[in-house]
Every structure is written in C-alpha cells, then in structure tokens.
Amino acid sequence: HGACFGDFNGDGHIDLLAPDAARGSRMNFLLNDGRGRFHDSTRRSKTWHTQARTHGMACGDFDNDGDLDAFLTSRDGNLLFANDGTGVFAEVSEKTGLAQPLGDTKAAAFFDYDNDGDLDLYIVRPGIDLLFRNEGDGTFKDVTEEVGVNDPGDGKSASCFDYDNDGDLDLYVVVHNGMNRLFRNDGTTGNWLAVKLLGTRSNRDGIGARIEVRTGSGLQVREVIGGKGHMQDPLVQFFGLGQASAAESVTIRWPSGRVQTLRSVEANQVLVVEEKA
C-alpha cells in the first residue's frame, strides 16, 4: 500500500523499499545495480522481519546522519527503521518514542515544520492525525494539540509544501468520505532554504538527485523523488536552517553523476540551480 524510491546505500542509484499489506509479510528491499536491474536485498537489509500489515511509508533522514531512514504505518503497530548508510536497517521505534499504540495508521510524511533542521513526522489515521516533533536528540514528542492539527477526520494521506510562500511548510491532508484539509503553518521563526533543480544532462526536474545542505549545526539531506505511497510531493526541496543566516554549502549530486557545490548560500530564498552542461 505504499513504497519509497531512494538511494538507500549511497551508491548513486535509486533503490526501492516496498512493504506488503498482508499479515505476517516483510518489507521488501530491492537494490538497484546501476545497470537497469533490481536485486532482492531484503534479508541483508534486515527488513524482512517486519510482520506488519503496512498501509504507508515515509522516507527521510530523521537523524541527520546522511542517509534515508524509513517509517512504516500499519494496523499492527508503526515501525521506524534507521539506516546505517549501507542499506542495512535497525528498528528503533521504541527508543525514539514512536512505539506507542496509534491505531490503524494510514500514511506518514517527514517534514521540518518548525525549521529547526530536524525532520518531524506527521502521521495520518482515522480520527485525529498526529504530529511528532523531532527533539534533535533521537526522540520524538507528540505536539498535535500544541500546534493545532487536531481536527478529526478519516485521513488517508498527506503532502507537505509551502503553499503561501511564507518560508514554512504547510500540510494538505486527503480525507476519505469528507472534506480534505489544508493546515497553514503560521508559527515558524527559523530560517529556511528551498532548492529547485533544473536538469540539463539529467531529467528536467532533477528527479533522482540528492541535495546536501550543510550549516554549522550539521548536514541535511533530501532526495528529489516526486512522491511516495498514495501522494505526489513537490519537487522543490525545503530545508530548515534554524538560526543560521546562510548555508555553508549546498551540494547537488545529479542523476547524470555530475556534482555541483555552491558555497555561502543566503537563507530565506528559493535557490534555483541549473545543472552544468
């Protein structure tokens, strides 16, 4: 019921995580060999033992260690997998505070709602959806009531984007048998940087590219994929910079293999980067 493309082992090729909705099933990890073929690496990745009826998935670098992690929503309990950078995963739901029973969750989205440089987690479910703030210490805190995303509804999926162009990410939630919901984010004070790619040798939208933004507080990574699970996502990649007035560097690893680095990039702008020919 949901899948994520991404470069999970850092070799520059887009792999696939594909969970199964059947009871007792595994999360399949298909490794791209760079020659147009995918190979089953599920057992090596240690994702085969999920045993959960999965509805959705979100991928993002929640611990800012430079690789893509994965969160699975399930009627049997949610699972957060931390990637070691080689495509081997450890299940860390309990130690991060996400092992609590949350009901029959449907979908999830990683996004930095408070622009502090850490990816937070929005979980869609029947009733009231949940927003967990990343505390920056490897744990998450439920801030649903605090930030005002506690409207009830039978949510199915969510997408995050800055619809009002005010420098923070808003939420659009798709609801089954009801009105869809748009939550405008008004409470963010941190600096930000949005990156839009224009491919020349690569595809025009830069799908498959990896963007690395470094500030004094560390490294953030995004990959341009365009969608996950049941939803599309914006191609513009958004980074919260906290109190940093500039990014020390912005590095783009294009699907063509070309690497571009820009230095001392000012905050609070949409940075358009065209791939060098």
What do the predicted segments below correspond to?
Residues 1, 25, 53-55, 76, ...:
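Beta-rich catalytic cores
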Residues 16, 30-52, 82-103, 133-153, ...:
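Blade-edge motifs of beta-propeller repeat domains
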Residues 145-147, 163, 167-277:
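Gly/Ser/Thr/Pro-enriched helix-cap/hinge segments flanking short amphipathic alpha-helices
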Residues 11, 15, 36, 69, ...:
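Acidic Asp/Glu-based divalent-cation binding sites
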